[in-house]
């Protein structure tokens, strides 16, 4: 009984952790996209002020050149985060499925559970340790 309760709590924790990770990725994506947009607006203002849009021109504004590099770096980071989002979303779905299975097992009363009490105790200790 105790190990099943702990297993259920563990599965809840795993779902919460995966949800937090996915939310963090989404938050970072939104922030990076906002920053890239702001920098692009500043680049446009600098180019308009200088009247030069050719990056290779000798009089191209230094700030605009540096901001353009920063936008490229942000776009690379955005692409990396998008690549990380799909596996994080998949991990969340898997954790939710495991939680659902554990809840169903708990609802059935754990029938068919013929584990050795010594093994259950070891599993419980490992869950407590980490």
Please identify what each model-predicted range represents.
Residues 1-130:
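Charge-rich amphipathic alpha-helical interaction elements
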């Amino acid at each position: 009984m105790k190990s099943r309760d702990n297993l259920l709590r563990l599965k809840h924790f795993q779902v919460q952790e995966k949800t937090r990770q996915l939310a963090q990725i989404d938050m970072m994506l939104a922030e990076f996209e906002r920053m890239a947009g702001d920098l692009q607006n500043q680049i446009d203002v600098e180019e308009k002020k200088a009247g030069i849009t050719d990056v290779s021109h000798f009089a191209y504004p230094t700030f605009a050149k540096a901001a353009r590099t920063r936008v490229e770096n942000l776009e690379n980071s955005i692409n990396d985060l998008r690549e990380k989002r799909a596996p994080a979303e998949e991990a969340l779905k898997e954790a939710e499925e495991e939680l659902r299975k554990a809840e169903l097992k708990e609802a059935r009363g754990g029938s068919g559970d013929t584990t050795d009490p010594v093994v259950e105790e070891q599993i419980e200790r490992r869950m407590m340790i980490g």
